[in-house]
């Protein structure tokens, strides 16, 4: 609506009374480039406040004057404007990464576009952008590597890819409102890990349930929730019986004698069924002697079948040959039977038995898995999420074992200040290139990390262990099987049994900053190259170009940088270059006249321009991040004041 106002000095403004103005009605955008701690390289990201600046580009650092760039940006933002920040490039920059064949490799990923434009196979995981900030991060992954651990066995001759079988006869099968018992059937699994190489003890293997085989030899896919391997046990039953050896007459000559004389000690005659042996039990009937219960033979001497027996207890009473003492000998025999329950069989792909175990311990694999942190206390995977398995998307297309969990941890606390802190959790992602969560959320782990993670990219695919087996075609024996190959990650889910890698960790190392390993000295040419990205006014809308620190070791380097920024402003003709003097000309110069002369000398060679503003120095302010007072250039404040004035005047 048109307003015709005739009263002098009256103007109309729309004001939001909740905040006192119209926020964003007149956006004032600054721009700065420099060697920030982290962030994408040469990508002008719009930052609205100091919190965004910290989250995207890190904090000010007390190294090589890096804080001047950061605090200039912060000063501008404090006036209410927004800021396009560019992190400058350097030939020394390197992303922290976990290499494929080495601990880390030389790799620089500048940005998301740089990542998607290239193929990376020399690392498994890398920090999202270059710098030492990524050193110390650890990436942990886990997939459906195994269902159970079978321990207490000898692993000699056993290798990954062999089969495991166990009878399930007599086990109860729960149906819909009914229960039945399995007949002559057995469950099959595949070995995915052996000993310490499989992440378990030297006397253990990891096993994944695959299917069950009916008595008719029919394969039926099954899961760990339906069937599992039970611990193998052996029970021994022992029974005792008493066998009569025979009876024989004998004499006891002394009142408390331990010998019996004149007895038949062999089966040659005299009522004996077999020879008397040590340990036989002796009893007596008739005569005058008393033999204590449990008395046994401990010695035998004989001549022509007639002899003397020595016993372990004294016999009371004397019995002569006419007293009619009859001694009976019996023998206790022991028998035992062994019953093996849930025997576990290891077979190769030809159905040939490799090992048979009668004593094992079967336990859940996932519940034993931890991250393996050495600082801040370890964390169990089952406290983070349930075990990954097969996604609904893959299952509906005949695929399996595609799910994977990925967690990023600050183990030593260098990034977050808390050792063992979980920085990111990416759960139930898919190894399938077309993997989705219904209805259409992409969860292919490589793309998901690229789009959603703030910390890491994926490079090469891991997972080299096959996780399935099937009967050989045309073979009547289901003991003969083929491994299900072709399970590499990064293909469409249809019909693929994806390979597994288990519980893995990846240390990110090798990250480098702008100079040396962790320095921030940067060539002025690299900074100017970043500013040159802003030359096209149709691509990026900006109002103020902030010089930041004067840059360069000499006044000539500083003048070259200032001249380049003024040239960009002159070319665009829609923004102002905010320039501060050479640092060495004003900081720590006690004489104000000398400072003035230095400022004049600095600005004199610079070209005149309607699109540049020169200020006169550096301000002394407190850096709360490093607990120290700093000198920083005023161009951030000058640009901020102009932005604030514009906002107040035209909003």
Residue ranges, per PLM feature:
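Polar, enzyme-active/binding microenvironments
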Residues: 194-201, 246-333
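A glycine- and small-residue-enriched flexible loop/hinge signal that marks low-structured segments
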Residues: 1-234, 239-245, 336-651
């Amino acid at each position: 609506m048109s307003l015709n106002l005739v009263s002098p000095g009256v103007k109309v403004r729309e004001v939001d009374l909740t905040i006192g103005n119209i926020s964003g009605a007149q956006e004032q955008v600054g721009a700065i480039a420099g060697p920030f701690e982290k962030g994408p390289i040469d990508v002008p990201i719009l930052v609205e406040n100091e919190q965004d600046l910290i989250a995207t580009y890190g904090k000010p650092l007390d190294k090589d004057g890096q804080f001047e760039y950061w605090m200039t940006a912060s000063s501008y933002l404090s006036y209410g404007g927004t800021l396009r920040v560019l992190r400058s490039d350097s030939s020394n920059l390197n992303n922290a990464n976990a290499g494929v064949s080495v601990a880390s490799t030389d790799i620089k990923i500048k940005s998301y576009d740089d990542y998607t434009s290239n193929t990376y196979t020399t690392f498994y995981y890398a920090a999202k952008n270059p710098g030492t900030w990524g050193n110390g991060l650890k990436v942990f992954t886990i997939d459906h590597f195994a269902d159970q651990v079978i321990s207490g066995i000898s692993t000699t001759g056993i290798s990954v890819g062999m089969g495991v079988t166990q009878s399930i006869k007599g086990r109860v099968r729960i149906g819909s409102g009914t229960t039945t018992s399995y007949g002559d059937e057995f469950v099959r699994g595949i070995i995915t890990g052996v000993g310490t190489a499989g992440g378990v003890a030297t006397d253990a293997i990891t096993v994944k349930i695959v299917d069950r085989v009916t008595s008719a030899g029919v394969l039926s896919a099954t899961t760990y929730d339906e069937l599992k391997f039970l611990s193998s046990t052996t029970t021994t039953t022992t029974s005792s019986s008493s066998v009569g050896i025979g009876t024989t007459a004998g004499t006891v000559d002394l009142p408390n004698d331990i010998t019996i004389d004149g007895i038949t000690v062999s089966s040659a005659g005299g009522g004996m069924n077999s020879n008397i042996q040590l340990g036989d039990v002796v009893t007596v009937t008739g005569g005058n002697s008393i033999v204590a219960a449990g008395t046994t033979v401990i010695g035998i001497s004989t001549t022509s079948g007639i002899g003397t027996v020595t016993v372990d207890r004294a016999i009371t009473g004397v019995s002569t040959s006419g007293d009619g003492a009859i001694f009976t000998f019996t023998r206790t025999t022991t028998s035992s039977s062994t019953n093996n329950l849930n025997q576990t069989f290891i077979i190769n792909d030809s159905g040939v038995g490799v090992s048979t175990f009668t004593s094992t311990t079967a336990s859940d694999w996932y519940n034993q898995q931890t991250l393996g942190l050495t600082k801040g206390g370890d964390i169990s995977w089952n406290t983070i999420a349930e075990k990954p398995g097969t996604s609904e998307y893959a299952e509906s297309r005949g695929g399996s074992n595609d799910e994977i969990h990925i967690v990023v941890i600050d183990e030593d606390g260098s990034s977050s200040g808390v050792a063992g802190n979980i920085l990111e959790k990416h759960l139930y992602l898919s190894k399938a290139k077309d993997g989705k969560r219904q209805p259409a959320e992409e969860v292919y782990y490589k793309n998901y990390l690229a789009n959603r993670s703030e910390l890491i990219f994926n490079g090469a695919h891991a997972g080299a262990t096959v996780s399935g087996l099937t009967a050989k075609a045309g073979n009547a024996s289901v003991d003969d099987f083929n491994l299900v190959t072709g399970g590499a990650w990064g293909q469409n889910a249809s019909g693929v049994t994806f390979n597994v890698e288990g519980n893995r960790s990846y240390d990110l190392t090798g990250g480098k900053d702008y100079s040396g390993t962790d320095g921030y000295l940067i060539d002025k040419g690299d900074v100017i190259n970043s500013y040159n990205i802003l030359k096209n006014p149709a691509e990026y809308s900006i109002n103020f170009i902030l010089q930041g620190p004067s840059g360069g070791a000499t006044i000539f380097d500083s003048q070259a940088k200032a001249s380049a920024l003024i040239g960009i402003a002159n070319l665009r003709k829609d923004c102002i270059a905010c320039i501060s003097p050479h640092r060495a000309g004003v900081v720590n110069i006690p004489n104000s006249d000398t400072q003035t002369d230095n400022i004049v000398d600095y600005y004199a060679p610079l070209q005149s321009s309607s699109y540049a503003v020169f200020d006169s120095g550096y301000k002394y302010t407190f850096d709360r991040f490093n607990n120290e007072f700093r000198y920083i250039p005023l161009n951030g404040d000058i640009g901020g004041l102009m932005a604030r004035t514009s906002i107040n005047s035209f909003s």
